[in-house]
Structures are given as structure tokens and as C-alpha cells.
Amino acid sequence: MEVKPFLKWAGGKTQILSQIEENLPKELKEGNIKKYIEPFVGGGAVLFYLLQKYEFKKVIISDINEDLMLCYKVVKNDVDRLIEELSSLRDEFLSLDEEKRKEFYYKVRDDFNKNKNDCDEVKRVAQFIFLNKTCYNGLYRVNKKGEFNVPYGRYKNPKIFDEQNLKNVSKLLKNVKILCGDFEIVDEYVDAESFVYFDPPYKPLNKTSSFTSYTKYDFNDDDQIRLAKFYRKLDKRGAKLMLSNSYNVDFFGKLYEGFNIKKVVAKRMINCKGDKRKDGIYELLIMNY
């Protein structure tokens, strides 16, 4: 079974999986890594790739985005009911004409924002996935109040979900521990037999390229510095570490001095100027091996 991400997600790693594979620690390929830990799991491209290819005794994932982590939890524990909810959203949406589809989208978005705390979890996740597949460019963006505020996307025939893929994801997540919080939440799980992959919100290369508003918590330079300190702390523990970030050589060269810093080419799928969706851009991979 081939498992693919079930959400569109900013900074998704599908485009650089081959470079990530080339740079994985040899201990992983030799079967000496027992634990995989990913504190910025996002859309899960790296997680799904590694879980299909390598054996781990323990897998721990986390992200600060509560709705995202609820998604993983529901897909893992209640996939059949989720598929029912999604089917009903999809069928109603696809039966409407364009103008009514737009109205339906905003109705679901309002429900999603209003019922944050007292909505049934499965229903909420179905709304989350529906919005992700029908909103503009598949973005996830919230305002400071934490309200999802992306406009309608006007796709002709959006594929809201892939039933078989969701079931496969559910199987793959069976033994995965799902956390939610700041990246330091994984600290207690990391030991010398761990491989940790960090994929934080990228430091913007310029003012317009910033896309870190997928939580109401900004990830700024202070957070990048805090993350680098955490990276050094885990390095001393003997864990194998890999981190992705933007091609900002001056900033990261100083921050991760002494580590193995490589330049890789990524193709970006989410970009507001639709015609530039597949530009190749450089990124950094930073490893402690």
C-alpha cells in the first residue's frame, strides 16, 4: 500500500523526499535506529515515507497546530466514521452549482470557527479536511483569534478525500504516539537510538515569502535560535538529527556552525501566484552526522 499525505500543507516535503532519503543517517539504513521523532509533522510526507520504508520500535509525532493533530488522532482512531462524515460533506457540495458551492464553503467555515470547543471531534476533522481541499490554494491560515480565514478556492472538481488512502494512513498510524505542542514537547522521548527530523516554519527569505501563519503563534528568529539550542542539546545526547530550513546561509550558517549543512533544490507546490507553483528553490538540510 502506498500512503500519501491526506492534506495539502505549506512547506510539504514531497518535493525533496529523494534528497532527504540520500541524506538519512547510515544507522537508520543499517537498522540501528529504534525511534523516529518528528516535532513539526505538518502534512506528514516524511513521516509516511519513512514508516513505509523503515522499521521503528517507537514513533512520536507532534505539531503546535491543535486542529492538525486532532486530524491525525481521528484518522488513527476513528477512520470509518470520519469517512462517513466526509462523504456527506462531499456529496452535498458536489451536488450544488458554483454559486451554491461557494455559500456552502462559507457555511462550513463559519461552523468550523464557531464550534471550536464543543463540536464532535470527528465532525470537526471532516470539516477541516473539507476546507483544506476546497479553500484557496489549499492553504491553512488563521487570524490572531485562531479563526480559519482562507477564502473559497473555486476548483472544478476537487477531490475532497481518498477513502483507501485514509484507511492506509490509519493503519500506518496504529502505533504512533500523537502529541500536540511546542517542539520541546518531544524532549523526554529522545535518546541515542533516535532519529529526529525537524521541519520548522521556515525563516522567510524576503518580506513577501513569509508563510508561517498556520498557527496563531508566529515562529520568529528567537524561536529559530531556541530551536538551534534544542538541536545542540539533543546532539549531545547522541541522537541523529536532520533539520530543513530556507536557504538563508548567513543566519543558519552561524546558528548551526559545526554541523553538516547541505544545499538542496525543492519545488514548492503552495504559492499564491498560481503560475509560479512549481518554481525550484534552494533549501538547507542540516545534519549532525
Curated annotation (Swiss-Prot):
Bridged cysteine pairs (disulfide): none
Pfam name, any one: MethyltransfD12
ATP-binding as UniProt keyword: no
Record's catalysed reaction(s): a 2'-deoxyadenosine in DNA + S-adenosyl-L-methionine = an N(6)-methyl-2'-deoxyadenosine in DNA + S-adenosyl-L-homocysteine + H(+)
Keywords in alphabetical order: DNA-binding, Methyltransferase, Restriction system, S-adenosyl-L-methionine, Transferase
InterPro entries hit by this protein: Ade_MeTrfase_dom_2, DNA_methylase_N6_adenine_CS, M_m6A_EcoRV, MeTrfase_D12, SAM-dependent_MTases_sf
Residues annotated to bind S-adenosyl-L-methionine: 9, 13, 63, 199
Entry GO MF terms: S-adenosyl-L-methionine binding; sequence-specific DNA binding; site-specific DNA-methyltransferase (adenine-specific) activity
Disulfide bond is among the record's keywords: no
EC annotation from Swiss-Prot or TrEMBL: 2.1.1.72
GO annotation terms (biological process): DNA restriction-modification system; methylation; mismatch repair
Similarity comment text for this entry: Belongs to the N(4)/N(6)-methyltransferase family.
Protein name: Type II methyltransferase M.MjaIII
Gene source species: Methanocaldococcus jannaschii (strain ATCC 43067 / DSM 2661 / JAL-1 / JCM 10045 / NBRC 100440)
